């Protein structure tokens, strides 16, 4: 009751029927007015690729996120501020560039083992299921980072099957659903995935400007959760929040083509894509972040 108004239009956080408004004393009204102003400010700073309804729901949810996290949301971050491993700062590479190294990647770059890498660092190399949402929330202005994945933790739970998608809700509070690769294959009558078909899937599923979480199974085994982002100039970019693949980094060569060439031919149902910049984070999983 009392939440049926539209704050983006009437500039009221609560309707006149809500007890806060109907029976508010002077101090309570001042608090409501302050929250209403914050809602309006957050809506104003959101990108144009969100609908007004999405902006309103996200703005209200941001207040809940602030309360649950115990921090105040800042201004939206740029891609550079949210990315470049800023979502996972404790990640440490097990192998480091070395012209004389004994190990070599697909690009011919040579590496040697990182002497500073310790067994305890491994948890920050298997925490992709929190790095992806951490990046999305950093874009909104939440200065949070990913925790490491340890046995029995909620990160461990999210690493299993379709569980990773449970962190996202639609703006009406219902569970958000991913577009599964297997479902897409069935609609195309494809029996298996190929690099060309992965590209087709990415382009079709990520056609609108926005931030998308991708769950992909590797040809070599195992899987990964990461980010595809469609920019307003039409570019579709692979952004890796777990370990930096931005321009100038040692992993710069890991791009959308790399994903297409590395994906499994016969993926599990849990693999797929979900647009997440227009979703609400499920605060039941808030403990997967450091702040």
Task: Briefly describe each language-model feature range.
Residues 223-225, 229-291:
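Active-site signature of cysteine proteases
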Residues 2-55, 60:
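Metalloprotease/metallohydrolase-associated module, dominated by Zn2+-dependent proteases
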Residues 64-171:
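Active-site nucleophile-adjacent alpha helix/oxyanion-hole segment immediately C-terminal to the catalytic cysteine
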Residues 138-223, 227-241, 247-254:
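Conserved active-site-adjacent core of cysteine acyl-enzyme catalytic domains
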Residues 58, 68-89, 268-278, 284-289:
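Acidic, amphipathic alpha-helical interaction segments
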Residues 39, 51-62, 154, 164, ...:
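Short amphipathic alpha-helical segments that mediate assembly, nucleic-acid/protein binding
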């Amino acid at each position: 009751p009392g939440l049926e108004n539209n704050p983006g239009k009437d500039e009221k956080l609560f309707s006149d029927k809500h007890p806060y408004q109907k029976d508010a004393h002077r101090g309570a009204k001042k608090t409501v007015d302050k929250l209403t102003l914050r809602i309006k400010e957050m809506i104003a700073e959101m990108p144009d690729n969100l609908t007004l309804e999405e902006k309103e729901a996200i703005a209200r949810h941001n207040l809940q996120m602030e309360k649950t996290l115990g921090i105040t949301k800042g201004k939206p971050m740029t891609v550079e501020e949210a990315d470049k491993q800023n979502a996972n700062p404790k990640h440490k590479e097990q192998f480091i560039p070395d012209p004389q190294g004994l190990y070599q990647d697909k690009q011919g770059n040579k590496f040697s083992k990182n002497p500073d890498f310790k067994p305890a660092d491994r948890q920050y190399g298997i925490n992709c299921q929190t790095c992806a949402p951490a990046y999305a929330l950093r874009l909104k202005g939440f200065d949070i980072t990913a925790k490491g994945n340890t046995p029995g933790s909620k990160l461990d739970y999210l690493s299993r099957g379709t569980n990773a998608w449970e962190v996202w809700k639609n703006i009406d509070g219902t569970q958000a659903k991913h577009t599964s690769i297997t479902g897409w294959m069935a609609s195309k009558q494809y029996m298996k995935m190929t690099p060309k078909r992965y590209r087709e899937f990415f382009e079709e599923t990520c056609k609108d400007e926005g931030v998308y979480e991708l769950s992909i199974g590797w040809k070599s085994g195992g899987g990964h959760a990461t980010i595809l982002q469609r920019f307003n100039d039409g570019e579709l970019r692979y952004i890796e929040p777990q370990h930096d693949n931005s321009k100038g980094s040692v992993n710069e060569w890991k791009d959308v083509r790399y994903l297409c060439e590395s994906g499994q031919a016969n993926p599990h149902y849990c693999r797929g894509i979900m647009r997440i910049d227009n979703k609400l984070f499920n605060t039941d999983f808030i403990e997967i972040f450091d702040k």
